[in-house]
Design a protein with these regions (language model features):
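Ubiquitin-like/PB1-type beta-grasp interaction modules and other compact soluble beta-rich domains
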Residues: 1-79
Length: 80
């Protein structure tokens, strides 16, 4: 199945892209996808808390993805 991934902030800068298109196995969950993204980052996202949104709605870790879903990895907002 094809999934579009939107990257923001630290994820965007670490991966060097604001959007990825991946082909994943059916039954992949958001937590499995997060693990894959962290592996692609070679440890640079270790310790970074990420929120996951599927089709523009925050989703639990074990949400099963479907073909054509848009997934966003959103680090916490920081500011002063």
């Amino acid at each position: 199945m094809k999934i579009k991934i939107k990257c923001f902030s630290q994820v965007k800068y670490t991966l060097g892209k604001d959007e990825l298109n991946l082909e994943l196995e059916f039954g992949t969950t958001t937590s499995k996808l997060e693990k894959l993204i962290r592996e692609k980052a070679d440890g640079k996202l270790d310790g970074v808390s990420l929120r996951v949104a599927v089709n523009q709605k925050y989703s639990p870790d074990e949400t099963e993805l479907n073909d054509g879903d848009e997934v966003a990895f959103i680090p916490p907002v920081q500011g002063g």
